Amino acid sequence: MAVSRMAALSLATCTRVASRAAMSALRAPAPALGSLQTAAIAPLKAAGFSAHQMVQRPTWSLTRSFHRSPVVCAELTRSLSRSPSGEFETLEYRLFFQNDQGETLSPWHDIPLRAGDGLFNFICEIPKDTSAKMEVATDEPGTPIKQDVKKGKIRYYPYNIHWNYGMLPQTWEDPSHANPEVDNTMGDNDPVDVVEIGEKQAALGEVYAVKPLAVLAMIDDGELDWKVICIRADDPKADLVNDVDDVEKEFPGTLTAVRDWFRDYKIPDGKPPNKFGLDNKPADKATALRVIQETNEFWAKLVKRATPRNGLSLV
């Protein structure tokens, strides 16, 4: 099929538009993808808007597709910008994603999974050497990035994470699926997590291509929480690592360090260590690719309403 025809089919898929006129008048220009600025919200507070009413999402235009061509994928990710609302590290903070027309896109649903040439798009939720527990809000329209909250307070890890951490778009760990490879453990109802081990610190919300290398089957509170180990495609060592054994050669001790970090990070809060399936070892690239494929299929069923959405936002 010609690329132009594939692009036309992709852009015609699942378009849905709604507007918020009152918010549109107050909306500030979106910053470029490489910058991160806090949006001015004083006029909204003065007008009496609540914190969640101040979220800037006046226009929805979803161009979701299950099979975008690499050309369409590249054009979409290049045109992305990030639009913050509220003060960083507060309950009100949200980071939205927009295209070059200023239309809000869901980082979970609208950014394509595949980036071409065996690579996948990665969305950084927690930059390396930081501790604020940021995450895509899967239950909010637009699925912006926000800081995790527990008992009304924003959450932090007890210490910095040493790698870029985030998620693969268009994936979902189905909580109704019992995985036979991991003692029939059910999915955790979230997108698949990624630990990106490259040397560069990513920006919050940065989207870039990564190469999968290995995967850990973490079991958190009885739920399966895959951790796909990746490296960014433009890292100086990206060409030297292609599978789990290469990681140990080029990044000695890293796989053990990743496993131990995620095993132990809840201990300072008085909780037991997390467990791991697959013999407590990182599995190879082939297993990682199977996990990505399977969870992409779970996501496709979710957005087609073939699976109960369990309070998740599909826009």
Predicted regions and their residues:
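PEST-like, low-complexity acidic/proline-rich intrinsically disordered segments
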Residues: 1-16
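Hydrophobic N-terminal alpha-helices or hydrophobic patches in metabolic proteins across all domains
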Residues: 14, 27-29, 36, 43-315
